[in-house]
Amino acid sequence: MTIRRALVGLMWSLAVTACGGGGSSSTPSTPAAPSPVSAVHYTALGASDASGVGSSVPCVPFTTCDAGTGYVPVLARTLRATRDVTLVNLGIPAAVLSPTVYDIGHRYGRDIPADFIARELPFVPSDSTLITVFGGPNDVNALADAVEKGAAGSDLRGYLDTQIRAFGSDTDRLVQGLRSRAPSAFIIVINVPNMAGLPYASGYSLQARQVLQYLSVGLTRELNRQNGRGLVIADAMCDPQTYAPGGFASDGFHPNDTGYAGLAQRLASIVASGTSSASASCAQMTIVPPL
Protein backbone atom coordinates (compact mmCIF):
# COMPACT_ATOMS: atom_id res chain seq x y z
CA MET A 1 0.00 0.00 0.00
CA THR A 2 2.88 2.39 0.85
CA ILE A 3 4.53 1.71 -2.52
CA ARG A 4 1.25 2.26 -4.38
CA ARG A 5 0.62 5.56 -2.62
CA ALA A 6 4.21 6.65 -3.29
CA LEU A 7 3.84 5.92 -7.00
CA VAL A 8 0.58 7.84 -7.17
CA GLY A 9 2.04 10.74 -5.21
CA LEU A 10 5.15 10.89 -7.38
CA MET A 11 3.10 10.99 -10.59
CA TRP A 12 0.90 13.73 -9.18
CA SER A 13 3.82 15.90 -8.09
CA LEU A 14 5.44 15.57 -11.52
CA ALA A 15 2.21 16.62 -13.21
CA VAL A 16 1.41 19.69 -11.16
CA THR A 17 3.64 21.98 -13.21
CA ALA A 18 2.99 20.23 -16.52
CA CYS A 19 -0.79 20.14 -16.70
CA GLY A 20 -3.27 22.87 -17.43
CA GLY A 21 -6.64 23.08 -15.76
CA GLY A 22 -10.26 23.28 -16.57
CA GLY A 23 -12.49 22.07 -19.30
CA SER A 24 -14.95 23.56 -21.69
CA SER A 25 -18.70 23.54 -21.16
CA SER A 26 -19.30 23.09 -24.89
CA THR A 27 -20.72 19.91 -26.36
CA PRO A 28 -18.27 18.76 -29.05
CA SER A 29 -18.95 16.30 -31.81
CA THR A 30 -17.38 12.88 -31.35
CA PRO A 31 -13.97 12.67 -33.04
CA ALA A 32 -13.56 9.86 -35.52
CA ALA A 33 -12.01 6.59 -34.41
CA PRO A 34 -8.42 6.01 -35.58
CA SER A 35 -8.31 4.57 -39.10
CA PRO A 36 -7.22 0.94 -39.57
CA VAL A 37 -3.73 2.02 -40.64
CA SER A 38 -3.05 5.22 -38.67
CA ALA A 39 -0.80 5.20 -35.61
CA VAL A 40 -2.71 5.05 -32.33
CA HIS A 41 -1.79 6.89 -29.15
CA TYR A 42 -3.87 4.93 -26.63
CA THR A 43 -4.45 6.17 -23.07
CA ALA A 44 -6.35 4.05 -20.53
CA LEU A 45 -8.00 5.42 -17.39
CA GLY A 46 -9.21 2.88 -14.88
CA ALA A 47 -8.63 1.02 -11.65
CA SER A 48 -7.43 -2.55 -11.04
CA ASP A 49 -9.16 -3.61 -14.25
CA ALA A 50 -6.70 -1.50 -16.25
CA SER A 51 -3.85 -3.36 -14.53
CA GLY A 52 -5.46 -6.71 -15.30
CA VAL A 53 -5.95 -7.81 -11.70
CA GLY A 54 -7.54 -11.25 -11.80
CA SER A 55 -5.78 -12.22 -15.03
CA SER A 56 -2.88 -14.64 -15.40
CA VAL A 57 -0.48 -11.78 -16.26
CA PRO A 58 -1.44 -8.64 -14.31
CA CYS A 59 0.56 -5.46 -14.84
CA VAL A 60 2.54 -3.20 -12.53
CA PRO A 61 0.75 0.18 -12.50
CA PHE A 62 1.96 2.81 -14.97
CA THR A 63 3.73 0.33 -17.26
CA THR A 64 2.88 -0.69 -20.82
CA CYS A 65 3.05 -4.38 -19.84
CA ASP A 66 3.10 -5.68 -23.42
CA ALA A 67 2.52 -9.31 -22.37
CA GLY A 68 -0.34 -8.54 -19.96
CA THR A 69 -3.65 -10.36 -20.24
CA GLY A 70 -5.89 -7.57 -18.94
CA TYR A 71 -8.10 -5.80 -21.46
CA VAL A 72 -5.78 -2.79 -21.87
CA PRO A 73 -2.69 -4.66 -23.14
CA VAL A 74 -4.87 -7.14 -25.06
CA LEU A 75 -6.60 -4.25 -26.86
CA ALA A 76 -3.23 -2.64 -27.59
CA ARG A 77 -1.93 -5.90 -29.08
CA THR A 78 -5.08 -6.30 -31.17
CA LEU A 79 -4.69 -2.82 -32.61
CA ARG A 80 -0.98 -3.42 -33.30
CA ALA A 81 -1.92 -6.07 -35.84
CA THR A 82 -2.51 -3.29 -38.38
CA ARG A 83 -0.75 -0.19 -37.02
CA ASP A 84 1.72 1.27 -34.56
CA VAL A 85 0.34 1.71 -31.04
CA THR A 86 1.75 3.75 -28.17
CA LEU A 87 0.15 2.90 -24.81
CA VAL A 88 -0.09 5.02 -21.67
CA ASN A 89 -1.85 3.04 -18.93
CA LEU A 90 -2.91 5.35 -16.09
CA GLY A 91 -4.95 2.77 -14.16
CA ILE A 92 -4.57 2.81 -10.37
CA PRO A 93 -5.80 -0.28 -8.48
CA ALA A 94 -8.67 0.52 -6.08
CA ALA A 95 -9.16 4.03 -7.53
CA VAL A 96 -12.63 5.52 -7.91
CA LEU A 97 -13.81 7.78 -10.71
CA SER A 98 -15.48 10.34 -8.46
CA PRO A 99 -13.67 12.64 -6.01
CA THR A 100 -16.96 12.88 -4.12
CA VAL A 101 -16.92 9.11 -3.60
CA TYR A 102 -13.22 9.31 -2.70
CA ASP A 103 -14.09 11.69 0.15
CA ILE A 104 -17.03 9.56 1.32
CA GLY A 105 -14.91 6.43 1.27
CA HIS A 106 -12.25 7.99 3.46
CA ARG A 107 -14.88 9.38 5.81
CA TYR A 108 -16.12 5.84 6.42
CA GLY A 109 -12.72 4.19 6.69
CA ARG A 110 -12.30 2.79 3.18
CA ASP A 111 -8.73 2.84 1.84
CA ILE A 112 -9.05 4.48 -1.59
CA PRO A 113 -5.73 5.60 -3.10
CA ALA A 114 -6.98 7.97 -5.80
CA ASP A 115 -9.76 9.31 -7.97
CA PHE A 116 -9.60 9.66 -11.74
CA ILE A 117 -9.96 13.44 -11.85
CA ALA A 118 -7.15 14.26 -9.41
CA ARG A 119 -4.70 11.45 -10.18
CA GLU A 120 -5.29 10.23 -13.75
CA LEU A 121 -6.77 13.05 -15.82
CA PRO A 122 -3.71 15.33 -15.40
CA PHE A 123 -1.49 12.73 -17.07
CA VAL A 124 -3.53 12.23 -20.25
CA PRO A 125 -1.19 13.07 -23.17
CA SER A 126 -2.47 15.78 -25.46
CA ASP A 127 -1.71 13.65 -28.53
CA SER A 128 -3.96 10.78 -27.42
CA THR A 129 -6.08 9.49 -30.30
CA LEU A 130 -7.85 6.75 -28.33
CA ILE A 131 -8.93 6.88 -24.68
CA THR A 132 -10.79 4.22 -22.71
CA VAL A 133 -12.36 4.95 -19.33
CA PHE A 134 -13.64 2.25 -17.00
CA GLY A 135 -14.75 3.60 -13.66
CA GLY A 136 -17.73 3.09 -11.38
CA PRO A 137 -17.53 -0.42 -9.91
CA ASN A 138 -15.27 0.74 -7.06
CA ASP A 139 -17.52 3.78 -6.60
CA VAL A 140 -20.52 1.47 -6.22
CA ASN A 141 -18.76 -0.65 -3.61
CA ALA A 142 -17.51 2.38 -1.67
CA LEU A 143 -20.98 3.92 -1.52
CA ALA A 144 -22.58 0.61 -0.57
CA ASP A 145 -20.02 0.25 2.22
CA ALA A 146 -20.87 3.75 3.46
CA VAL A 147 -24.56 2.81 3.49
CA GLU A 148 -23.74 -0.32 5.48
CA LYS A 149 -21.99 1.93 8.03
CA GLY A 150 -25.00 4.20 8.42
CA ALA A 151 -24.28 7.03 5.97
CA ALA A 152 -27.83 7.07 4.60
CA GLY A 153 -29.54 7.51 7.95
CA SER A 154 -33.31 7.02 7.62
CA ASP A 155 -33.53 8.11 3.96
CA LEU A 156 -31.80 5.41 1.95
CA ARG A 157 -33.15 6.27 -1.49
CA GLY A 158 -32.64 9.99 -0.94
CA TYR A 159 -29.02 9.40 0.01
CA LEU A 160 -28.39 7.13 -2.96
CA ASP A 161 -30.00 9.59 -5.38
CA THR A 162 -27.83 12.40 -4.03
CA GLN A 163 -24.65 10.38 -4.53
CA ILE A 164 -25.71 9.31 -8.03
CA ARG A 165 -26.22 12.96 -9.01
CA ALA A 166 -22.84 13.87 -7.54
CA PHE A 167 -21.22 11.07 -9.54
CA GLY A 168 -22.87 12.50 -12.65
CA SER A 169 -21.44 15.94 -11.94
CA ASP A 170 -17.99 14.45 -11.42
CA THR A 171 -18.35 12.53 -14.68
CA ASP A 172 -19.14 15.82 -16.43
CA ARG A 173 -15.89 17.23 -15.05
CA LEU A 174 -13.90 14.21 -16.17
CA VAL A 175 -15.30 14.24 -19.70
CA GLN A 176 -14.79 17.99 -20.07
CA GLY A 177 -11.22 17.56 -18.85
CA LEU A 178 -10.52 14.77 -21.32
CA ARG A 179 -11.94 16.78 -24.21
CA SER A 180 -9.83 19.76 -23.17
CA ARG A 181 -6.60 17.79 -22.76
CA ALA A 182 -6.95 15.53 -25.81
CA PRO A 183 -9.40 17.18 -28.23
CA SER A 184 -8.69 14.74 -31.07
CA ALA A 185 -9.15 11.56 -29.04
CA PHE A 186 -11.84 8.97 -29.75
CA ILE A 187 -13.13 8.27 -26.23
CA ILE A 188 -14.86 5.06 -25.16
CA VAL A 189 -16.47 5.05 -21.70
CA ILE A 190 -17.41 1.64 -20.31
CA ASN A 191 -20.50 1.84 -18.15
CA VAL A 192 -21.03 -0.06 -14.89
CA PRO A 193 -22.23 -3.67 -14.77
CA ASN A 194 -24.99 -4.52 -12.33
CA MET A 195 -22.74 -5.35 -9.40
CA ALA A 196 -25.59 -7.26 -7.74
CA GLY A 197 -25.26 -9.83 -10.51
CA LEU A 198 -21.53 -10.45 -10.11
CA PRO A 199 -20.39 -13.58 -8.26
CA TYR A 200 -18.77 -11.70 -5.36
CA ALA A 201 -22.21 -10.40 -4.29
CA SER A 202 -24.05 -13.71 -4.50
CA GLY A 203 -23.90 -14.29 -0.74
CA TYR A 204 -24.98 -10.77 0.24
CA SER A 205 -28.37 -10.04 1.79
CA LEU A 206 -31.19 -9.03 -0.53
CA GLN A 207 -31.09 -5.43 0.66
CA ALA A 208 -27.33 -5.21 0.16
CA ARG A 209 -27.72 -6.48 -3.40
CA GLN A 210 -30.61 -4.06 -3.99
CA VAL A 211 -28.34 -1.20 -2.95
CA LEU A 212 -25.62 -2.43 -5.30
CA GLN A 213 -28.14 -2.66 -8.13
CA TYR A 214 -29.66 0.77 -7.46
CA LEU A 215 -26.23 2.37 -7.48
CA SER A 216 -25.01 0.42 -10.52
CA VAL A 217 -28.03 1.38 -12.61
CA GLY A 218 -27.91 4.98 -11.41
CA LEU A 219 -24.21 5.41 -12.16
CA THR A 220 -24.61 3.70 -15.53
CA ARG A 221 -27.38 6.13 -16.49
CA GLU A 222 -25.13 9.05 -15.56
CA LEU A 223 -22.36 7.60 -17.74
CA ASN A 224 -24.79 6.86 -20.58
CA ARG A 225 -25.88 10.49 -20.47
CA GLN A 226 -22.45 11.36 -21.87
CA ASN A 227 -23.09 9.41 -25.07
CA GLY A 228 -22.77 11.77 -28.03
CA ARG A 229 -21.00 14.43 -25.98
CA GLY A 230 -17.72 13.78 -27.72
CA LEU A 231 -17.57 10.09 -26.78
CA VAL A 232 -19.27 6.71 -27.15
CA ILE A 233 -20.41 4.19 -24.53
CA ALA A 234 -19.45 0.53 -24.28
CA ASP A 235 -22.50 -1.07 -22.68
CA ALA A 236 -21.22 -3.46 -20.00
CA MET A 237 -24.48 -3.15 -18.05
CA CYS A 238 -26.74 -4.68 -20.69
CA ASP A 239 -24.29 -7.09 -22.33
CA PRO A 240 -25.05 -10.66 -21.18
CA GLN A 241 -21.41 -11.56 -21.77
CA THR A 242 -20.48 -9.33 -18.83
CA TYR A 243 -22.15 -11.77 -16.42
CA ALA A 244 -20.94 -15.07 -17.92
CA PRO A 245 -19.73 -17.21 -14.97
CA GLY A 246 -16.65 -18.36 -16.86
CA GLY A 247 -15.40 -14.79 -17.20
CA PHE A 248 -14.52 -14.13 -13.55
CA ALA A 249 -11.45 -14.61 -11.40
CA SER A 250 -11.67 -16.50 -8.11
CA ASP A 251 -12.62 -13.32 -6.20
CA GLY A 252 -15.86 -13.08 -8.18
CA PHE A 253 -15.23 -9.38 -8.82
CA HIS A 254 -12.41 -9.06 -11.34
CA PRO A 255 -12.50 -10.65 -14.79
CA ASN A 256 -10.15 -13.50 -15.63
CA ASP A 257 -8.31 -13.88 -18.94
CA THR A 258 -11.54 -14.89 -20.68
CA GLY A 259 -13.47 -11.93 -19.31
CA TYR A 260 -10.75 -9.44 -20.16
CA ALA A 261 -10.35 -10.88 -23.66
CA GLY A 262 -14.07 -10.48 -24.27
CA LEU A 263 -13.99 -6.85 -23.13
CA ALA A 264 -10.94 -6.12 -25.29
CA GLN A 265 -12.71 -7.60 -28.30
CA ARG A 266 -15.80 -5.47 -27.69
CA LEU A 267 -13.63 -2.36 -27.48
CA ALA A 268 -11.71 -3.32 -30.62
CA SER A 269 -15.02 -3.68 -32.45
CA ILE A 270 -16.05 -0.19 -31.33
CA VAL A 271 -12.74 1.23 -32.55
CA ALA A 272 -13.24 -0.52 -35.89
CA SER A 273 -16.81 0.72 -36.36
CA GLY A 274 -16.42 4.12 -34.75
CA THR A 275 -19.85 3.79 -33.13
CA SER A 276 -21.51 2.28 -30.08
CA SER A 277 -24.72 2.76 -28.14
CA ALA A 278 -26.11 1.91 -24.72
CA SER A 279 -29.56 0.55 -23.92
CA ALA A 280 -31.90 2.71 -21.87
CA SER A 281 -33.23 -0.42 -20.16
CA CYS A 282 -32.56 -4.14 -20.15
CA ALA A 283 -33.17 -7.26 -18.07
CA GLN A 284 -29.73 -6.94 -16.47
CA MET A 285 -30.88 -3.78 -14.68
CA THR A 286 -33.28 -5.82 -12.52
CA ILE A 287 -31.29 -8.90 -11.58
CA VAL A 288 -32.77 -8.61 -8.08
CA PRO A 289 -36.13 -7.03 -7.14
CA PRO A 290 -35.82 -3.22 -7.24
CA LEU A 291 -35.17 -1.33 -4.02
State what each model feature region is.
Residues 137-138, 148, 175-213:
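Active-site segments of SGNH/GDSL-like serine hydrolases
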Residues 16-18:
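C-terminal motif of bacterial Sec signal peptides marking the signal peptidase cleavage site
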